[in-house]
Amino acid sequence: MNIAKRLTIYEDKGFSRERAEINVLMEAAALAIFRDFPEAFVLFGGATLVLYHDSLRHSADLDLLWRGSEAPSREDVAACLKRDLSPLAEILGMESLAFEFQNLADREARIYVNATGRQLFRVDLTRLGSAIEGEVESHPVDGEGHGSAVIKCVTKDPLLLQKAEAFLLRRSVKARDAYDVHLLRERRAKLTSNLRAHLEDSIRMNEINSESIATRIGKIDRKLCFLELKPILPADVYALLEDSDFEPLRESLKELYGEWL
């Protein structure tokens, strides 16, 4: 991996140096995991948007959905990360990396990657959902001295489903979900009939009505976006949204949930 080149690419997009370094570490983490466990995982979530869909929103979560009956242990995954990330962190001038574990629920685990008491990012291991079986694309990566791998990622459409459900089901509305929905729709992501049926099921099972959806969309306002998006977006990107009073985010949500409003 050409570290200087990768850092420059992220900085040119508007990421700070610190966040560019985290993105490079997450790239290396994905390469290491898919090289050592080529059939075990699918990459999902916000990091996928940053790495493969040009999202400018900082995401410090590397979400891995595992396939099959048994995933590699969290210890095996952490050992893989330690071997590949430690030399890279040293080049970036970071102190020794530390890895902490957290079990969240049955068949799930979380690995925190820390340096000098600061959390850099985390790796979530979660069971693959049936809604996205077959919705996977491959990205060959040449890691130069670290070998090569084919990184398998969920496609844009199920990522849109994930964000659509997250926006409605979280206890409190998150502006980052609205931003991700807007980004994915700009990237021409859509809900296929199968994915739309899954969203319909989620809405019905959770007894979400049109008024509730409209209320949540209305909460994407200046105050919430200032608190949640300003810290994680490049200044120029945030300024454009602010100048439009964040209407593009609300409009994307209205279009997404149109038939339920």
Locate each region found by the language model:
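Structured mid-to-C-terminal alpha-helical surface segments
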Residues: M1-V42, Y52-L62, R67-L261
